[in-house]
UniProtKB/Swiss-Prot annotation:
Organism: Flavobacterium johnsoniae (strain ATCC 17061 / DSM 2064 / JCM 8514 / BCRC 14874 / CCUG 350202 / NBRC 14942 / NCIMB 11054 / UW101)
Record protein name field: Endoribonuclease YbeY
Cofactor binding description: Binds 1 zinc ion.
Superkingdom in the source lineage: Bacteria
Record Gene3D superfamilies: Metalloproteases ('zincins'), catalytic domain (3.40.390.30)
Length: 139
């Protein structure tokens, strides 16, 4: 089950479309969907988590806590809406595209993809692009 929680004024326009897409992303990686909680927040909220739990005194767009057991992926994914907005501007993409990238990024970590080395980051970016292309909204 995929849940969206809001600790900021932001909210998704079409939660069901995002839920369907993220479920398809999980299936495409041959994993089973456990409980995945997305928590949308601001920089201050996520910075506190980064310092308290990871001992990193920096701003970030996403922090994920992985509770995956075996093939069933579960966890809490915190997303700073402010960072996503700034990154979208920096990368010259729409807010929605950058948001999709971040949402997929969290799932891909749970599927075992890393991004610390250049090679791993390149594979992660490729997988993000592949998963973003899977998103569609029925018109």
């Amino acid at each position: 089950m995929i849940n969206f929680n809001y600790e900021t004024e932001f909210s998704l326009d079409n939660e069901q479309a995002f839920t369907d897409w993220l479920s398809a992303v999980i299936v495409s990686e041959e994993k089973n969907e456990g409980e995945i909680n997305y928590i949308f927040c601001d920089d201050e909220y996520l910075h506190k988590i980064n310092v308290e739990y990871l001992n990193h005194d920096t701003l970030t767009d996403i922090i994920s806590f992985d509770y995956t057991v075996g093939n069933e992926i579960s966890g809490d994914i915190f997303v700073s809406v402010e960072r996503v907005e700034d990154n979208a501007k920096d990368f010259n993409v729409s807010f929605e595209e950058e948001l999709k990238r971040v949402l997929a990024h969290g799932i891909l970590h749970y599927c075992g993809y890393k991004d610390k080395s250049d090679a791993d980051a390149e594979l992660m970016r490729s997988k993000e692009d592949e998963k973003i292309a899977m998103f569609h909204v029925e018109q």
